[in-house]
């Protein structure tokens, strides 16, 4: 087998017919500027071809289910293996998907609990065991010799009534004695029982003394007792001790029943095991009182009840007024000053008590009726669930929030699953073990106390769980819990989870293609990730990693630098060789940064800010340990800390949502905190994340930044357009008039091919230009509207240099380093980093008030060091205008450029959530307890 992957003539996207050789069974890093063509080479060429060749070997029937497998634009690729891609885009947003289900650890846990778990009565009556008649006989014979006993069959347990028919049936069946409420009676002499009291009735089946030769008689009596007692029997040993036995998993005292233990009982995705209240989601949509009564200092008359404030009719305010008058509640008293009973009446209704309601609507319709008062919470709930109107449902949804399910307490499972414990009654149930961090979970497995028999059964299962947890630990995810919803994971976290799953599969001879696995990972955990990658390589796999992280590049076996620029200025192989060889290559920008010839300088001075703060007190969501944090305004702030230390919780769940709630009246509830002050010092909150700028190909840089409006205005003012009577709408490809109707302005037509992938062909009428021929006859400076959309930002800047309004907006796109994208490039083809910078560009051309707060979560994702230098210049422009920029970041070049650092930690998960250090980078670098400070110190000295 050849030891290289040889690629000839790769032309996907911006690749310029390149030839490249990649050594097999090595750790290969592909790097280059954002947009240079790294992903085009790794994913759209190598992975796409490896995947396509595998799928081609399947039957036509199987192929139809595997979707799009186009042949990449490449002449030939030799030496390919089956390819597995681990990217960041395929995180499941399904609320039923958790870390445990994605890693398949849940499957093994379910097996463990089904095989060695013991159910315990939820009412505190001890272990629930199922015993056959044979096992019961053995246990009875093991009692001390000469023990006197009677065998009883329980037939009434804690039931009210006189039970006369039951005594008649017992007599008819030939039994002589019964025990009623602990006293023995002849069945014909039972006193009359009280109707209103609970009673226990057992039939005396036999009386015995434990001695040799009673096995046969005992066996018959036990079987008879089980038959009569519906699978239950009691042994009364005459010295006051009672033994309870059951054929079923059922508590002999209270009757709490557990089905046979099998893995499906412990699955929250199966009706058999899921919580009946929340259907296994762990959360339930409930009416949130804080949203229903946003201002408790208001009275009912002043509109304390938000859902019932008059919008289009006075129906509910009238009902409220008449009901309160009838029940004697003062409408002028502030809501918070009402008695508890009065508040309950307003919120949850009057039960069966009625009031007289009289209402005439605007159309003369009349209601004159005695009805119970519904209560505002009950009303919102009913209207949400019963309405057929999407509008009403959305309005009611605004007063509701996802709260932890009160039945299962967020564990997602029913009582029967949660009563099963491993390692005795004090051991955890499956819900509790899923709430542990991976590090604690590993420790618990070491300390699990099992009997010899249980240990033998559990050994292979525990090994599988232990191995998988260890892999997760090794890629820096020790702070995650198995119950964490997959949809809440960052791109880097979900990628490392899939990486851990792949390491666990122990495959060899596979080609793995990874997309920036170091995203969201602190420098401290980077070494463990690189070790994991090397482990995969040592199994005999080839790893191609698209990465910008300097440590990963230096530890790679082979480095490929794609460039020299981005977009049409990239797509060539600038350097290929060992990291040392690339570092010596003068043409390679990456090489210049690796060798230290190029670097991002440390700012000469730190800004002092405007002296104002936003202060949060008592932040206690997730793992935050009641923090008091001050965010100085007018500065560039970096929030740092190891993965899982609480950065996203503090910034995204608390600060961002609390500010949005005050500024934008946002209904999204912030995480737990005591108080927040200083919001009055800012006017705008701008969240700049990496989500796409548009979900359809109709959205593009020109439409997103608003420059397309100005360009269409310009075309509408040309002489030709005026003569023809064209307005600016004529130059939109989204509405009828100017667009090509054959393709509805898409420029392409989709042809469904069933057993082959869908084919997209350029529209035959407009040839991919989106507009009809009449519209394209209008020119500005000899270019029509379609030709303008095909221009790169750099070209458009020169073309529109005489029109300041347009040039200013296009300049901002160039300033964020996107000079290579075309104005009409579909938004769906932009990477996360490009989308984020496009959002920055659209902010740059807005007039600055100097009172904005910009929040960016890991803005360096997908960025080369050279791109980061450009990004920092843009962010510093915002701060120099008096605004505040807050980034969550691990990249040391960004951290060292900040004015103020808030470092959380010291560890992730339960070991984090504290402030380890705050201050300038120089101050944080001196704090010995700070991992960030340790790495920052080295960086500042460079």
From Swiss-Prot:
Domain ABC transporter: 308-589, 609-937
Keywords, in A-Z order: ATP-binding, Cytoplasm, DNA damage, DNA excision, DNA repair, DNA-binding, Excision nuclease, Metal-binding, Nucleotide-binding, Repeat, SOS response, Zinc, Zinc-finger
InterPro entries from the UniProt entry: AAA+_ATPase, ABC_transporter-like_ATP-bd, ABC_transporter-like_CS, P-loop_NTPase, UvrA, UvrA_DNA-bd, UvrA_inter
Zinc finger motifs (C4-type), residue ranges: 251-278, 740-766
Keyword Iron-sulfur listed: no
GO terms assigned for molecular function: ATP binding; ATP hydrolysis activity; DNA binding; excinuclease ABC activity; zinc ion binding
UniProt cross-references to NCBIfam families, sorted A to Z: PRK00349.1, uvra
Identification of the protein by name: UvrABC system protein A
Native organism: Streptococcus pyogenes serotype M3 (strain ATCC BAA-595 / MGAS315)
Organism lineage string: Bacteria, Bacillati, Bacillota, Bacilli, Lactobacillales
């Amino acid at each position: 087998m050849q030891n290289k992957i040889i690629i000839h003539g790769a032309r996907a996207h911006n690749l310029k017919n390149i030839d490249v050789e990649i050594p097999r069974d090595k750790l290969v890093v592909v790097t280059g500027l954002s947009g240079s063509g790294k992903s085009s080479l790794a994913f759209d060429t190598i992975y796409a071809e490896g995947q396509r060749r595998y799928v081609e070997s399947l039957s036509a029937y199987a192929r139809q289910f595997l979707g799009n497998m186009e042949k990449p634009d490449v002449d030939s690729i030799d030496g390919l293996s089956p390819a597995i891609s681990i990217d960041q885009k395929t995180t499941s947003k399904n609320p039923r998907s958790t870390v445990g289900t994605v890693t398949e650890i849940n499957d093994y846990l379910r097996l463990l609990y089904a095989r060695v778990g013991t159910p315990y009565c939820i009412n505190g009556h001890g272990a629930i065991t199922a015993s056959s008649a044979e096992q019961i006989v053995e246990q009875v014979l093991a009692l001390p010799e000469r023990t006197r006993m009677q065998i009883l069959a329980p037939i009434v347990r804690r039931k009210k009534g006189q039970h006369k028919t039951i005594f008649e049936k017992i007599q008819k069946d030939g039994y002589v004695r019964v025990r009623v409420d602990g006293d023995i009676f002849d069945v014909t002499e039972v006193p009359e029982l009280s109707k209103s009291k609970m009673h226990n009735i057992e039939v005396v089946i036999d009386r015995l003394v434990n001695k040799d030769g009673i096995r046969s008689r005992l066996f018959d009596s036990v079987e008879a007792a089980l038959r009569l007692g519906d699978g239950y029997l009691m042994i009364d040993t005459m010295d006051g001790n009672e033994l309870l036995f059951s054929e079923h998993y059922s508590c002999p005292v209270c009757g709490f029943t557990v089905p046979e233990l099998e893995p499906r009982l412990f699955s929250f995705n199966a009706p058999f095991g899921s919580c009946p209240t929340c259907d296994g989601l762990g959360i339930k949509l409930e009416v949130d009182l804080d949203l229903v009564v946003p201002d408790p200092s208001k009275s009912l008359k002043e509109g304390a009840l938000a859902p019932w404030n008059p919008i289009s009719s006075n129906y509910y305010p009238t009902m409220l007024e008449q009901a309160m008058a009838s029940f004697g509640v003062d409408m002028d008293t502030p809501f918070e000053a009402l008695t508890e009973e009065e508040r309950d009446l307003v919120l949850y209704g009057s039960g069966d008590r009625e009031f007289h309601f009289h209402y005439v609507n605007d159309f003369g319709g009349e209601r004159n009726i005695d009805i119970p008062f519904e209560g505002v919470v009950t009303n919102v709930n009913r209207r949400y669930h019963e309405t057929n109107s999407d509008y009403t449902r959305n309005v009611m949804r605004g007063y509701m929030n996802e709260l932890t399910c009160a039945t299962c307490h967020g564990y997602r499972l029913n009582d029967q699953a949660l009563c099963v414990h491993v390692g005795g009654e004090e051991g955890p149930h499956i819900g509790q073990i899923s709430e542990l961090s991976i590090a604690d979970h590993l420790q618990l497995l070491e300390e699990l106390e099992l009997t010899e028999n249980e240990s033998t059964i559990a050994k292979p299962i525990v090994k599988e769980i232990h191995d998988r947890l260890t892999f997760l630990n090794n890629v820096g995810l020790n702070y995650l819990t198995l119950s964490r919803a997959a949809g809440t994971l960052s791109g880097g976290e979900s990628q490392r989870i899939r990486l851990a799953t792949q390491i666990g599969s122990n495959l060899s001879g596979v080609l793995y293609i990874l997309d920036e696995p170091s995203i969201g990972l602190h420098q401290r955990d980077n070494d463990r990730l690189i070790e994991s990658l090397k482990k995969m390589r040592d199994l005999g796999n080839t790893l191609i990693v698209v990465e910008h992280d300097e440590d990963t590049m230096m530890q790679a076996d082979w480095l490929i630098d794609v460039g020299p620029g981005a977009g049409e200025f990239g797509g060539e192989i600038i350097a290929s060789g060992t990291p040392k060889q690339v570092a010596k290559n003068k043409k390679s920008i990456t090489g210049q940064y690796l060798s230290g010839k190029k670097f991002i300088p440390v700012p000469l001075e730190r800004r002092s800010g405007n002296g104002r703060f936003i202060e949060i007190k008592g932040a206690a969501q997730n793992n935050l340990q009641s923090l008091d944090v001050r965010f100085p305004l007018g500065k560039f702030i970096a929030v740092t800390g190891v993965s899982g230390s609480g950065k996203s919780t503090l910034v995204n769940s608390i600060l961002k949502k609390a500010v949005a709630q005050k500024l934008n009246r946002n209904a999204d509830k912030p995480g737990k905190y005591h108080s927040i002050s200083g919001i009055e010092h800012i006017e705008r909150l701008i969240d700049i994340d990496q989500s796409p700028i548009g979900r359809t190909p109709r959205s593009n840089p020109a439409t997103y930044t608003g420059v397309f409006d100005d360009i269409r205005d310009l075309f509408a003012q040309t002489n030709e357009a005026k003569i023809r009577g064209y307005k600016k709408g004529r130059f939109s490809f989204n509405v009828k008039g100017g667009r090509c109707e054959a393709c509805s302005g898409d420029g392409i037509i989709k042809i469904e091919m069933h057993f082959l992938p869908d084919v997209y062909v350029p529209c035959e009428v407009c040839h991919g230009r989106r507009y009809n021929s009449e519209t394209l006859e209008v020119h500005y400076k000899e270019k029509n509207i379609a030709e303008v959309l095909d221009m790169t930002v750099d070209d458009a800047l020169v073309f529109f240099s005489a029109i300041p309004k347009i040039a200013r907006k296009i300049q901002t796109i160039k300033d964020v380093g996107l000079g290579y994208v075309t104005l009409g490039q579909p938004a769906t083809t932009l990477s996360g980093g490009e989308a984020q910078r496009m959002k920055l560009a659209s902010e740059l051309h807005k007039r600055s008030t100097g009172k904005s707060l910009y929040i960016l979560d890991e803005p360096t994702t997908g960025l080369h060091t050279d791109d980061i230098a450009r990004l920092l210049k843009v962010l510093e422009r915002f701060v120099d205008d008096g605004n505040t920029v807050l980034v969550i970041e691990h990249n040391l070049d960004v951290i060292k450029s900040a004015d103020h650092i808030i470092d959380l930690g010291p560890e992730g998960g339960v070991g984090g959530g504290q402030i380890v250090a705050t201050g300038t980078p120089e101050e944080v670098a001196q704090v010995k307890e700070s991992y960030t400070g340790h790495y920052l110190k080295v960086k500042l000295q460079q």
